[in-house]
Structures are given as structure tokens and as C-alpha cells.
């Protein structure tokens, strides 16, 4: 039977980039985007409609809704972030990067939108083979609490990957009784 301390130590070994806390779970509270702009509420409504269209794989229509949301409120970082996602799904990474850069310039530093935009931008960089830029953005998203970003950082770290592989082999041998 393992103690909570044992589990915390093992968790830190297996997940070296995960933040530690007394409970083993980091609590990060991200701020919501909120703007004092006359068109912000309408922009949010149009954005929700765009998300529904994107979920139905009606990407052209979704992009139109996100664009309308931005016409109503050009300072809405979430609309840029969501339009970037639709562009990514259409395999238009340049347009997605433009929107993600704009979302990050408008979003507060500790917002859900910033976290999502960092993950999206890092994913594009990773697909392009630009691991340094991907690592930087995944690290920013990880600091904001993204568990996906934390896993990607481990995957991008060759030493952590090697350590995880060796530990997996040790545990497998221990389960099967091998020396």
C-alpha cells in the first residue's frame, strides 16, 4: 500500500513538468475575458453560433460568424481564438497563426483564451517542426494549467521521454517478475 507521499514522489518522477502542491494537484484559476465594449455581448452570441456551426463541421459558415463577431467587437480575443481553430481545421495555418497572434495580443495574461491560444499556436509550430517555438508556447500554456501542454512538454523533452521509457520498462519487469 502506498502513502500519499509515495504517490506524490512517483507522480513527480513520471510527470516532472507538472507543478507540485500539497494535494499533488495545482490549482490555477484563469480569468474570463470581459470587455467594456458596446458590441461585446452581441459578439459573444455570434461567437456561440459560430462554435455550434464548427462543431457541426460547417467551417465556412462558422468562420463567417466569427468574422461577424469580430466586426461587432474587434477587441474580442476569444472570437479570434475560435476563428483560428476553424482555420486550423481547414488546414489554413497562416490564417490561424494571424488570428492566434491577435488573440494573444488582446487576451489578458491569465485568461482561458490565452491558454487555448498558446496551445493552438504551439500545435501549429509543432506540426511545422519548429519545436523551440512549440516548447515556448506549450510552457506558457502549462503555466496557465493546460494538462495537454504539460504532456506535450514532456514529449518534446528527450531526457524526460527516455526516463519515462526506462521507468515503464522497470515497472513492466516488476509486474512480470523479471530481473
From Swiss-Prot:
Gene3D superfamilies recorded for this chain?
Tetratricopeptide repeat domain (1.25.40.10)
Q: Which keywords fit this entry according to its UniProt record?
A: Repeat, TPR repeat
TPR repeat ranges per the UniProt record = 43-76, 78-110, 115-148
One Gene Ontology term from the biological process aspect of the record: tyrosine metabolic process
Q: What InterPro entries does the entry give?
A: TPR-like_helical_dom_sf (IPR011990), TPR_rpt (IPR019734), TTC36 (IPR038906)
**PROSITE patterns, per the entry:** TPR (PS50005), TPR_REGION (PS50293)
**Entry-linked SMART domains:** TPR
The record ties this protein, via Pfam families, to:
TPR_11
As for family, the record states: Belongs to the TTC36 family.
What protein is this chain from? Tetratricopeptide repeat protein 36
Instruction: State the organism of origin.
Output: Caenorhabditis elegans
Amino acid at each position: 500500500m502506498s502513502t500519499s507521499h509515495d504517490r506524490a514522489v512517483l507522480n513527480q518522477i513520471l510527470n516532472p513538468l507538472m507543478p507540485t502542491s500539497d494535494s499533488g494537484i495545482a490549482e490555477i484559476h484563469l480569468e474570463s475575458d470581459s470587455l467594456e465594449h458596446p458590441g461585446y455581448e452581441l459578439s459573444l452570441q455570434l461567437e456561440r453560433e459560430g462554435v455550434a456551426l464548427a462543431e457541426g463541421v460547417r467551417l465556412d459558415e462558422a468562420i463567417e460568424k466569427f468574422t461577424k463577431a469580430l466586426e461587432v467587437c474587434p477587441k474580442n480575443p476569444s472570437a479570434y481564438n475560435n476563428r483560428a481553430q476553424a482555420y486550423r481545421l481547414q488546414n489554413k495555418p497562416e490564417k490561424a497563426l494571424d488570428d492566434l497572434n491577435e488573440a494573444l495580443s488582446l487576451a489578458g495574461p491569465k485568461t482561458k483564451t490565452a491558454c487555448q491560444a498558446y496551445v493552438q499556436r504551439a500545435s501549429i509550430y509543432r506540426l511545422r517542426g519548429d519545436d523551440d517555438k512549440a516548447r515556448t508556447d506549450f510552457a506558457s500554456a502549462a503555466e496557465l494549467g493546460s494538462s495537454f501542454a504539460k504532456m506535450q512538454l514532456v514529449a518534446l523533452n528527450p531526457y524526460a521521454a527516455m526516463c519515462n521509457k526506462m521507468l515503464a520498462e522497470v515497472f513492466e519487469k516488476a509486474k512480470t517478475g523479471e530481473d
